Structures are given as structure tokens and as C-alpha cells.
């Protein structure tokens, strides 16, 4: 797999929520379920695929100096939170359906068990 850093390919909302959790000292463990709402093209089912890419993304979650500098330039993040992001790496547990089975809308494809600020980016 590649070593591409896709960390900033997230909604800005997720990062602002993380800053709110950071400021309030809220970083309890959570369980997030990953699922999809509708089959692509209104098909009757889907096939679970892409787990290697998801794991690669999670393993490479981090904020580079340029990422943090970009976020600083937005003028909405506090310096102590940006410092936290500069040392960010995911730690937690991932439970996922293996590649290949047929899956349906609202089936849980993956559970993310981690501190809320880490789970938020997965």
C-alpha cells in the first residue's frame, strides 16, 4: 500500500468538533459503527471491498507540518490544539467484515473503538 497522507481529506466539521472535545477535556472511549445507507446505483446488494485501503488510511493518519500550518492559516484553531494535532496518530481497535461477503445497507461494516478525538477522523 501507499504511504499517502489523506488526513486532511475530511470535513472541517470533524476537526472543529475535535477542538471542542480537546478544549473540554473530553476524550472518552467510544465505539463508532461504519455503514452505508444505500447501495450504489440502487442495486440490490453490495460486496464488501476496500479493507486494505481503509487500514492503510488509518495507519497513515497524521498531520504534517504543512497540514498544521494550513489549519493555522484558517484562523479558527487554537495553538494548543494545533500542537496536539502535530503529534496525532491513531491508536485504537478496528473490527471489520473481511473482503468479499455480500452486504446490505445499514449493515455494520466496521467498528472503530478508540478515544473520541481519534475515532472522529476514521
Q: Which residue stretches match the model-derived regions?
A:
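Ordered alpha/beta subdomains of enzyme catalytic regions
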Residues: 1-122
Amino acid at each position: 500500500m501507499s504511504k499517502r497522507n489523506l488526513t486532511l481529506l475530511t470535513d472541517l466539521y470533524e476537526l472543529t468538533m475535535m477542538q471542542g472535545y480537546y478544549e473540554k477535556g473530553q476524550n472518552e472511549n467510544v465505539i463508532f459503527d461504519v455503514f452505508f445507507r444505500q447501495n450504489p446505483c440502487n442495486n440490490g446488494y453490495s460486496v464488501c471491498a476496500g479493507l486494505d485501503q481503509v487500514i492503510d488510511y488509518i495507519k497513515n493518519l497524521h498531520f504534517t507540518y504543512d497540514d498544521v500550518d494550513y489549519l493555522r492559516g484558517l484562523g479558527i484553531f487554537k495553538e494548543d490544539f494545533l500542537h496536539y494535532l502535530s503529534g496525532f496518530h491513531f491508536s485504537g481497535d478496528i473490527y471489520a467484515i473481511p473482503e468479499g461477503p455480500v452486504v446490505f445497507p445499514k449493515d455494520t461494516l466496521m467498528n472503530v473503538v478508540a478515544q473520541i478525538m481519534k475515532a472522529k477522523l476514521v
